[in-house]
Design a protein with these regions (language model features):
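Accessory cap/linker subdomain of secreted extracellular hydrolases
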Residues: 1-25, 29-30, 39
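Structural motif corresponding to alpha-helix initiation and N-cap regions
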Residues: 35-39, 61
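Well-formed, non-transmembrane alpha-helical positions, independent of function
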Residues: 41-44, 66
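Short beta-strand/loop motif that positions the catalytic acidic residue
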Residues: 45-46, 51-54
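Acidic beta-to-alpha connecting loop that harbors the catalytic carboxylate
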Residues: 55-58, 82-84
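Conserved loop-alpha-helix segment in the C-terminal half of the alpha/beta-hydrolase fold
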Residues: 57-75
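Conserved beta-strand scaffold positions in the cores of enzyme catalytic domains, especially
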Residues: 77-79
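Catalytic active-site module of serine/aspartate enzymes centered on a nucleophile-bearing elbow/loop
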Residues: 81-112
Length: 112
């Protein structure tokens, strides 16, 4: 599938592979993962500033869109043209560093 190909191209090549990591989680993680619902706690984070970043080609984009809808203000959703799910891990040409710096500066120091 395209999703398998995207993850393979990152995690199984020099781009994202490391001899110190494994994509095989311990079996004890499976139950925790299956019981994890990330949207459940959004209201405990809001109204703190929330920033959601997704790629317009990301298979996971719908999750960012849904989380953004559930979050209270202040919130910001940034969609990066041409980016897939893993592209923002290492494709620094796509990472909006100026926008990230502005968000954190405004959010962590609202007085300027």
């Amino acid at each position: 599938t395209p999703i398998d190909r995207e993850f393979y191209d990152f995690y199984r090549t020099a781009r994202g592979n490391s001899p110190d990591t494994s994509t095989q989680p311990p079996l004890s993680s499976n139950v925790r993962f299956m019981n994890f619902y990330p949207f459940e706690d959004i209201e405990t984070i809001s109204p703190r500033p929330m920033l959601f970043i997704t790629g317009d080609q990301a298979h996971s984009r719908e999750f960012s869109d849904q989380a953004y809808q559930l979050a209270a203000e202040p919130k910001q959703l940034v969609t990066i043209p041409g980016a897939g799910h893993v592209d923002l891990y290492d494709r620094v040409d796509l990472i909006p560093f100026d926008m990230l710096a502005a968000f954190f500066q405004n959010s962590l120091n609202p007085q300027g």
